[in-house]
């Protein structure tokens, strides 16, 4: 299976007792982290490596035997801010090295939006809506907190997400009764950097959203009213890493070297006539 590589990673390190000392070395360009408490004590942090090809194994190695959960940081500036947010902070933040910003056209568009959103709304309503959507998502991400004890099924999901994704496994969270915390957990999970949220829908609409962020992990939160119409085709496209967008300007996106996590939250069991049983990791609420 291809190995994930990146310059920038975000990490969460759970601990008990004394705050762990992080032994960063010359392979690290920059790091920031802080002590947070949301149900339990943990360090939340962000690391930039000097090498653009730092693997997950190499990133874990610098923690000298500690066992953090690491994910690739898609937006370095947002990741840095999230690692130093005031909400849930107990101590810190602490920094190591020199942070390197990335110039981006996206940031320039957001600067235009912030400076004169009303003008953008008139001149380009579509661009305005996209910028507004991104801003609202960032605000939610920065203010997101999980102030509940994890239920056993939620802990099981988190353990699965600590493993490397593959091209087949689909995590299916099944809870027929309702009020088990599926949607709340799905929304919280989708606010993590590198994750997207889909409530179901038509293939064209869903794939248009997926191909806008093709490297994301994806949460499919299926409403009870749509349980009979789960879009298995989209789920398989995302897992198989060959994604077809036929809306507006048809295109095919291939991402063969980058498997992602896919989680379905539903009130129904998977239809084994539409997904092979060996693909499903079933978790019951």
Swiss-Prot record:
Positions with a binding annotation for a divalent metal cation: 36, 42, 87
Compartment list: Host nucleus
Gene Ontology CC terms: host cell nucleus
Sequence motif RCR-3, location on chain: 82-85
Keywords annotated in UniProt: ATP-binding, Covalent protein-DNA linkage, DNA replication, DNA-binding, Endonuclease, Helicase, Host nucleus, Hydrolase, Metal-binding, Multifunctional enzyme, Nuclease, Nucleotide-binding, Nucleotidyltransferase, Transferase
Sequence motif: Nuclear localization signal, positions: 52-74, 99-105
Active site (catalytic residues): 82
Short motif RCR-1, span: 10-13
Reactions it catalyzes: ATP + H2O = ADP + phosphate + H(+)
Family matches, as Pfam families: RNA_helicase (PF00910), Viral_Rep (PF02407)
E.C. designation(s): 2.7.7.-, 3.1.21.-, 3.6.1.-
Gene Ontology molecular functions: ATP binding; ATP hydrolysis activity; DNA binding; endonuclease activity; metal ion binding; nucleotidyltransferase activity; RNA binding; RNA helicase activity
Signal sequence residues: none
Motif stretch (RCR-2): 42-44
CRESS-DNA virus Rep endonuclease domain segment(s): 3-99
Cofactor details (free text): Divalent metal cations, possibly Mg(2+) or Mn(2+).
GO BP, sorted A to Z: DNA replication
InterPro entries in the cross-refs: CRESS_DNA_REP, Helicase_SF3_ssDNA/RNA_vir
Binding site for ATP: 175-183
Cofactor(s) required, per the database record: Mg(2+); Mn(2+)
Known role: Initiates and terminates the replication only of its own subviral DNA molecule. The closed circular ssDNA genome is first converted to a superhelical dsDNA. Rep binds a specific hairpin at the genome origin of replication. Introduces an endonucleolytic nick within the intergenic region of the genome, thereby initiating the rolling circle replication (RCR). Following cleavage, binds covalently to the 5'-phosphate of DNA as a tyrosyl ester. The cleavage gives rise to a free 3'-OH that serves as a primer for the cellular DNA polymerase.
Family per record: Belongs to the nanoviridea/circoviridae replication-associated protein family.
Further remark: The genome of nanoviruses is composed of six to eight segments. In addition, some isolates contain subviral DNAs.
UniProt name for this protein: Para-Rep C6
Lineage of producing organism: Viruses, Viruses incertae sedis, Alphasatellitidae, Nanoalphasatellitinae, Clostunsatellite
